[in-house]
Amino acid sequence: IMRKNIVIGKEKEEDLIKELSKRTDIKAERIKRLLELQDLTKKENSPVKILFDQIINLPRFKDFDLIDFPRIVSVEENFDLLNTPKDHSSRRETDTYYIDENHVLRTQMTVMWSFYLKNSEVLKKLETEGYIEALSLGIVFRKDEIDKSHYPAFHQVDGLYVCKKSKKVIT
């Protein structure tokens, strides 16, 4: 068993960023600045990358697939597919950065689940081997007032382990 690095296509994100770059409204300017922030999970020698590398190289996680997906995702991917209620406060413009009515800056790395579970190789592995496992780490965005303990961008790791009961019972 070997870890796979699965990179989800970012073409849609690139198109949305091109459209965003044409805008000059305050909301667009704020989002453009946030998108310029480095994802410290990918920056060599950053304390965040060092810590996350230690996590993903723990014996328990050494074979987990690593999922990299766009920073801009659809409302469906960020909320609907994770069963976030339509009236949940996290959907409000006061809590989430909306690019347009259908796209947001990702608010959590859990969003990777829908991308991962749609991958044909992943589904084949689940069928043949009885389990799948993945981690996703990266920068996420939430509207927070900046103070000593809050910033609108931070780094997060999320994991997923799914198995057939015949393979393992998780307690």
Where are these regions (language model features)?
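TRNA-recognition modules of translation machinery and tRNA-sensing kinases, especially anticodon-binding
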Residues: 2-171
